[in-house]
A protein has these predicted regions:
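Short glycine/serine-rich donor-binding loops of glycosyltransferases
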Residues: 346-349, 367
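Conserved donor-binding/catalytic core segment of Leloir-type glycosyltransferases
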Residues: 62, 239-261, 267, 282-283
């Protein structure tokens, strides 16, 4: 009988043999022009960004992450990478290759870094390190800047015999309640980098020994299919296609099926709202990403919790809901919910605010950075307060509209992809 350790070793030798000589997966992105954003941010800001990029012209940059689809990181890179190209930087986006075991381990690491009590065994560490070692072998080329996104590829640099260029680690989640054993394991690899990027200064752990730390919140692309303007007729057609009535109140949460996003709590909140607003509908939209093996299990749990209430709609990319459809549902909604228990930032909140929608969201992590309480939405604690605020907004359309208008302007000033591009250019120049 084979031991677990031997099975792991045989499995990874097989993967390495199959992939030796290959490269990391290169993600192709559609071209973008910075000039297309003139009407949104103004000519002066466009010129400022181009001037900032002059000293970086011809520099080679690569972004490395775990998936090309699903989740906020992939969405950000699909806009950021082509805009970096447009200002004269030679930039690539590459995705690591790994086994299902690896993604199960990194999901546990992700949960542990957000405070969940998860096992973290010697075998799990071995799976993590073997995959990072494999990806170091697949990583080819020389770059002036290498940007590593999140924990999955953080140890690639550990196996690099000769470090060339500046290596930057970008952390997208909230580690303030991280399990100590998991944080210590990851920290040793973070500290090999030249710089690290966090969403909030509160996310920077006191024991992190790294000279260069940048605070850069994420951002959205206002011209992407997920955020661009849509005609009312198109919105109506998309929503009705999924058997949601656009003429009745709609509350929506867009997030993965994940315990941290608390879809079960959202359903409980909706049931409280329905006692007051009888015709309300709930839409839960998720993208099922290939680095999220826990997603299916939690989808089934959510479906069981929803029961046979035909006013609860569980939608995902697997039944044809893509970026355009998410856009339409956000625009058709009366209130957007984000009832996360932990949230590094929550791009879907910024997306909703950009569409002029009031947001009711949990007062956790990076959410208060976006939701200015009582001005662009409501920050809430428990399910009862969440339901109370949703009912308030459904019954007072004037307040809802006022919050939505304020929210859009707040995003224009703080959370557009052009600001994120500028932040990266400043960081590269500083290194």
């Amino acid at each position: 009988m084979l031991t677990d350790k031997l099975i792991i070793n045989l499995k990874y030798k097989k993967i390495l043999k199959q992939r030796r000589g290959n490269m990391l997966e290169i993600v192709k992105t559609e071209g973008k022009s910075l000039n297309d954003y003139i009407d949104i941010i103004g000519k002066e800001e466009i010129e400022s960004i181009r001037k900032l990029a002059l000293s970086l012209k011809g520099k080679k940059v690569v972004h490395i992450n775990a998936t090309s689809f699903g989740g906020g990181v992939a969405e950000i890179l699909s806009a950021l990478v082509p805009l970096m190209k447009d200002v004269g930087i030679e930039v690539e986006w590459q995705v690591i290759k790994a086994s299902d075991d690896f993604f199960n381990v990194t999901k546990a690491i992700h949960n542990g870094l957000q405070g969940m009590d998860v096992p973290f065994t010697k075998e799990m560490k071995e799976v993590f390190l073997k995959n990072n070692q494999l990806n170091e072998k697949l990583f080819e080329g020389e770059y002036d800047f290498v940007v590593i996104h999140d924990p999955q590829p953080v140890a690639i640099l550990n196996y690099r015999q000769e470090k060339k260029g500046k290596w930057i680690w970008r952390f997208h989640i909230d580690p303030t309640s991280a399990q100590e054993k998991i944080w210590k394991f990851i920290k040793q690899f973070i500290e090999k980098h030249d710089a690290a990027i966090f969403t909030l200064k509160e996310y920077v752990k006191d024991d992190l020994k790294l000279k260069n730390i940048a605070i850069i919140p994420p951002a959205i692309d206002p011209l992407s299919p997920k955020n661009m303007d849509l005609k009312q007729e198109e919105i109506k057609n998309i929503v009705t296609k999924y058997k949601v009535d656009p003429d009745r109140p709609i509350i929506t949460q867009v997030s993965r099926f994940d315990p941290w996003k608390d879809p079960l709590g959202v359903i409980d909140m909706y049931r409280m709202v329905k006692r007051e607003v009888k015709d309300v509908q709930l839409v839960l939209i998720a993208s099922m990403a290939n680095d999220d093996p826990e997603g299916w299990e939690y989808y089934e749990k959510t479906a069981r919790h929803a029961g046979e209430d035909y006013d609860i709609h569980l939608l995902s990319n697997l039944n044809g809901v893509g970026n355009l459809e998410v856009n339409a549902f956000q625009r058709a909604s009366d209130v957007i919910i984000q009832k996360s228990l932990r949230e590094g930032f929550g791009l879907v909140i910024t997306e909703a605010l950009w569409k002029g929608k009031p947001v009711v969201a949990a007062n956790v992590g990076g959410i208060p950075l976006q939701v200015d309480n009582r001005r662009t939405g409501f920050l809430v604690g428990d399910i009862s307060e969440c339901a109370e605020r949703v009912i308030h907004l459904l019954k007072d359309s004037e307040i809802a509209h006022k919050m939505g208008t304020s929210g859009k302007e707040y995003v224009r000033k703080n959370f557009l992809i052009t600001r994120l591009l500028k932040d990266y250019l400043n960081l590269f120049n500083s290194l």
